Amino acid sequence: MLAYYVSVNQGPGIEQKSLPQLTRLLDQGRVKALVFIRDTSTGQTFLEGRYTRPAGPTENAEIVVPFRTVVDLEFNRDLKQFLASKGFPEIDVKVIHNFWGQAFLSVLPFLLFILALYFLFRQQIRMAGRGAFSFGKSRARLLSGGKTKVTFKDVAGVEEAKEEVQELVEFLKDPKKFQKLGGRIPKGVLMVGPPGTGKTLLAKAIAGEADVPFFSISGSDFVEMFVGVGASRVRDMFEQARRHAPCIVFIDEIDAVGRARGTGLGGGHDEREQTLNALLVEMDGIESQEGVIVIAATNRKDVLDPALLRPGRFDREVRVNLPDIRGREQILRVHAQKIKLSKNADLSALARGTPGFSGAELANLINEAALIAAKKGKDNVDQPDLEEARDKVRWGKERRSLAMSEEERKTTAYHEAGHAVLNVLLENTDPIHKVTIIPRGPALGVTMMLPASDKYNARKKEVLDDLCVAMGGRVAEEVFLGDISSGASGDIRQATWYARKMVCEWGMSEKLGMVHYADDSSMVFLGRELGTSRGYSEATARAIDHEVQHFIQAAYEKAKRIILEHKDKVEALAQALLEYETLNADQVTEIVKTGKMTNPPSKNSSPVSNGGEASSTKSPARQEETTKDGGLLPGLEGAPA
């Protein structure tokens, strides 16, 4: 329309002449006709007429050419007089009314603006929920056996959990086998366990094995910025599930929507509670139906609402724990199938050296070993690559580029020597694996210990010896350097944590006895924290602090007594660390037992300025007791030296 409007105004074959050009044509007497035109749609005024052009070589007569000159004739008296002198005393006036063109031009900006808004909102609506009215629709993805290649053969190390979820698949395939005895399929199964143990992998295996529809959704997919969307999505998901019954609904990280009600401050939790109420009704309410099995996974069962956990909603709880030595070996063999492994690789030995590792960490270990071997240009992955990957995953990568002064290296060497000597001399400690003053991860130096086997209980004499080893670094600094550093901050922090566990939870204090004094610090809800009072008096709190201090002070004095008795061994080990930087278990034990080393390692090619952080680390020997940090005790991590 715009092109049409312009073509109408301009006319076909009309030449545009300027005022000087028109003046020349008038002087030459070539202008034959003139009309004054006023265009009301554009507000322009111009002269329009015809002039003659001499004939060309191929033309027989003069050519008459239409032209147009934009000019304001009404206010140009000189031009009027000039035109009158050239034979045009009176000029006709013509008014043009182009209503449709004018109307179109006036609304064109608004049309463009509305069009831009339309495309913008259309794109956002598509991104938000596949349509303007689909915010309340379920985002559960429907999977079938052909869409996932994971089966129960790919799940290893959690045999008991695998057996329990396999029963669901067997029931769906042959329900009469169970129904003839009056049994019914569980309405819900809650998989609980630490992160990385294979809960989601089990769900993928169920999807790969089951011959029924499998809906998969995350707990966070129910929550949206709009009020009421979560409850609507829950209802829509179960409505779809009932249409496809019998089927399985898997909710990953259900703690995102199933947290206990009545906690938290403000109104943000009301929407989540509304979503949870809808979930409770759909799982076991008036309109609930059999044939829809709900499987959920979480690593925070303690935060879930009690109404969600009762039988009728989740009839069965499946514990997916950290794998034992046999489970770790099975997991390693599953993941080792994806890499080129050399014949000398011993996965059984690697499984013994990875206590406390989850399935995800073992998968990462195998991948790191493959990357290390590829970086070295090898054709396959051998045992040293696996050992190096294990140390990297557990204690961090070596930081050889970190430059430190000789004084700091010396402090680190004596600190680690103190840990190592006590670890060898004391009876109830885990075997030493390696000692290094090369930085690893956040630590400047590491004393590595690996348990000989999986441990599930902490005996008191083991805990006391561990506390003594933790004090070894600080004592060695004090005895040999005459000063102390901040390198023991991680040891002190975790020794305090361990001693408080002994007093408050494990009943290992003779003074306070077998009473549980611990606050429920695992609860992360502000509302529940505000409503919880400490279950003991101020006098008891002071007694707890005194007992914690007593355990740590006793460990410190014992460590100091042993190090003073074996100063020559600590000195020899520290000097060996300064010279070689890294010593293995046999070399450390030989120095502690004989005072010398007959089979020293090759000297490190790295600059002697590379040092380490005065810290010790030990693998988590007790899988039930882990903390945020890693380190000498379960979860201990060093601090700057």
From Swiss-Prot:
EC number: 3.4.24.-
Pfam families per the UniProt record, alphabetical: AAA, AAA_lid_3, Peptidase_M41
Record keywords, A-Z: ATP-binding, Cell inner membrane, Cell membrane, Hydrolase, Membrane, Metal-binding, Metalloprotease, Nucleotide-binding, Protease, Transmembrane, Transmembrane helix, Zinc
Major enzyme class: hydrolase
UniProt GO BP: protein catabolic process; proteolysis
Region annotated Disordered, chain positions: 593-641
Cytoplasmic compartment spans: 122-641
Residues that hold ATP according to the record: 193-200
GO molecular function: ATP binding; ATP hydrolysis activity; ATP-dependent peptidase activity; metalloendopeptidase activity; zinc ion binding
Cellular-component GO terms for this entry: plasma membrane
Transmembrane segment boundaries: 101-121
Periplasmic side: 1-100
Coiled coil (UniProt feature): none
Keyword flag Metal-binding: yes
Localization annotation: Cell inner membrane
Catalytic residues (UniProt): 416
Biased composition (Low complexity): 599-610, 630-641
Cofactor(s) the record lists: Zn(2+)
Subunit and interaction comment: Homohexamer.
Family label: In the central section; belongs to the AAA ATPase family.
Its biological purpose: Acts as a processive, ATP-dependent zinc metallopeptidase for both cytoplasmic and membrane proteins. Plays a role in the quality control of integral membrane proteins.
HAMAP family: FtsH (MF_01458)
Name of the featured protein: ATP-dependent zinc metalloprotease FtsH 2
Organism of origin: Methylacidiphilum infernorum (isolate V4)
